[in-house]
Amino acid sequence: MSNKGQLLQDPFLNALRKEHVPVSIYLVNGIKLQGNIESFDQYVVLLRNTVTQMVYKHAISTVVPARAVNFRVDDSAEA
């Protein structure tokens, strides 16, 4: 994955994790998963609800937070 992709994903997912924001994650096959982001890395997201699920990022279509989240992206690194 490109570094630019990580510049957007990491701050967004980290804000959702730190603020314990409930999310809906839509997979490319249309399935909707709900829970809180427990952790993430370059390839997977750990989603916690009644159980913890490891969701591969390549299977994720959309991440929808239950509320607005402020996250900082370093503009100086984008070009």
Swiss-Prot record:
GO terms for cellular component: cytosol. Keywords: RNA-binding, Stress response. One of its GO terms (molecular function) is RNA binding. Residues 10-69 form the Sm domain. Belongs to the Hfq family. Homohexamer. This is RNA-binding protein Hfq. It comes from Cupriavidus taiwanensis (strain DSM 17343 / BCRC 17206 / CCUG 44338 / CIP 107171 / LMG 19424 / R1) (Ralstonia taiwanensis (strain LMG 19424)).
